[in-house]
Amino acid sequence: MGPDNRRILLATVLSVGILILWQVIFPTKKVPPKPAPPPAAEVAKPAAPASPAPGAAAPAVPAPPPDAPEETVKLAGKGFEATLTTYGGALKSLRLEGDKFRKQEKDREVQIDLVHVTDGQPYPLSLSASPELGGAADVAADPGARAPMRIVAKDASSVTFEGRVGNLAARKTFRVTGKPYELALDVELSGGAGNGTVGVLYPAFMPPDTKSGGIFSGPPLDFVRPVCRAGTTTERFDLAKEGAPEKLEGQVSWAGVDQHYFVAAVLPAEPIGTCTFVRGPVKGAGLAALAVPVEGGARKLSLTVYAGPKDLDTLRGYGRGFESAIDYGAVAKFFALFARGLLYVMRWLEAIVRNWGVAIILLTVLVRLVLFPLTYKSMQSMNEMRKLQPEIEKLKAKFGDDREKMNLAVMQLYQKHKVNPLGGCLPMLLQMPVWFALYAALQTSVELYREPFLWMKDLTAHDPYFILPIAMGISSFVMQKLSPQPADNAQAKMMLYFFPGFFTVIMLFVPGGLTLYIFVNNLLSIVQQQLMMKHQQAAPAPAAGK
């Protein structure tokens, strides 16, 4: 195989790597099937107040609200404000505090709320008894989960509800613990008979037309999924799909809802019970149910509720595999360890310079320094190839259209002068794992969410004015221009124009932090190459030999 063909082969390999990166960044849009319209009789007929019989289908319309008027209580914790409701004695809203935890909603910015439910769904942390304990067979449509409870005690940091769950008396106390984004929940069940289970419910709703990822964007901030850690496996539940309930194997360490940079979950004191994902009662709705065994009609539970950002150190502090709430994706998960390493380095740099954009620039410099011995040898090889260009032109004139003989002669020329024609591609190959890892860090690390740099308001979002991608494309073109060109003119044009253009199009909608890294890396490569060319300019070109 000739040297030019080898360059094209390696370029093709790089293109495949870029295409893989494209698939990671821009996953295929999931288009859920259109829901079938409900029968006319069900639309006109009001919902019956009685619970559905065991084994009956889920109702197509939301259950009616409780008759008793709703009361709410607000608890202010460290970094959040929780609103608790008497409907189920549960969590109606949990808003994160601070300018960082805001999102754009239509024409205004609002605080991020980690509760996502729709009409007919229970609220997070409501309870549902199994049929053996007087509850409903379909937990997703159980009206008892929103049954009114009464407030029996409250102060600035706690509230206690009392009511019934199936045929059990229930007492639920929520307390602010003083830790960031944390509540404590104590549950006491009594007064029943027999054995069964009581589910601690964490529901979620996402409009069926929500994109899980499109051609030009990753998942939106409000892309939510019920999630559960059972045994040693963390599973996420796709609300866009239809199907029967899914029960996970193994005792449950935590269960809740995953929302991109955030997680809201309930953690028992120790692994217990089972976890089931259940769909309904409407399209796009579902829940994770932590089913806890109840024997003799009584049970006490001490639960921790965490609802906040996916800070790696914080999640690790809880143990129980809680750090697996950070989802690196199918491909990027192979770079998860590397991504965490990059994040720790960037956090250290940001603590010094107090700007995440500058920290990414300094990270680029550090990576270049680490890879300098390899990139130096690679650029030496490129410069040696450039010196041989006059001899290659002579070979092109000598052999004309006989490409096989020309490639053989060029390869012999490279061997004679100990030049590796593939050496120039080594720097990009070495950088690709860094790109994947940095992309994974940008997509999963809340530290970089809404962090500005220059004209960009958020380094985890794409450049709104496309300045960086275009600048990156120009710098890639300059790098190709400085590199030795293949002997074949068509191949030379493809290397010079196609790859920078193709790469620019891909980078238009990736996170600005990744584009910044690649742009700065290109600039450093250009400067290094220019300095080496000036340093070696005085050296005589190697003779072709006789």
UniProtKB/Swiss-Prot annotation:
Biased composition (Low complexity): 41-60
Predominant location category: membrane
Location relative to the cell: Cell inner membrane
Keywords for the protein's UniProt record, in alphabetical order: Cell inner membrane, Cell membrane, Chaperone, Membrane, Protein transport, Transmembrane, Transmembrane helix, Transport
InterPro entries, A to Z: Membr_insert_YidC (IPR019998), Membr_insert_YidC_N (IPR028053), YidC/ALB3/OXA1/COX18 (IPR001708), YidC/Oxa/ALB_C (IPR028055), YidC_ALB_C (IPR047196), YidC_periplasmic_sf (IPR038221)
Biological process (GO), any one: protein insertion into membrane
GO cellular component, one term: plasma membrane
Pfam (any one): YidC_periplas
Region (Disordered): 31-70
Keyword ATP-binding appears in the UniProt entry: no
Topology with respect to the bilayer: Multi-pass membrane protein
Domain of life of the source: Bacteria
Membrane-spanning intervals of the chain: 8-28, 326-346, 356-376, 422-442, 459-479, 498-518
A molecular function GO annotation: membrane insertase activity
PANTHER family reported in the protein's UniProt record: CYTOCHROME C OXIDASE ASSEMBLY PROTEIN COX18, MITOCHONDRIAL, OXA1
Functional description taken from the UniProt entry: Required for the insertion and/or proper folding and/or complex formation of integral membrane proteins into the membrane. Involved in integration of membrane proteins that insert both dependently and independently of the Sec translocase complex, as well as at least some lipoproteins. Aids folding of multispanning membrane proteins.
Family membership noted in the UniProt record: Belongs to the OXA1/ALB3/YidC family. Type 1 subfamily.
Quaternary structure and partners: Interacts with the Sec translocase complex via SecD. Specifically interacts with transmembrane segments of nascent integral membrane proteins during membrane integration.
Protein's name in the database: Membrane protein insertase YidC
Organism: Anaeromyxobacter sp. (strain K)
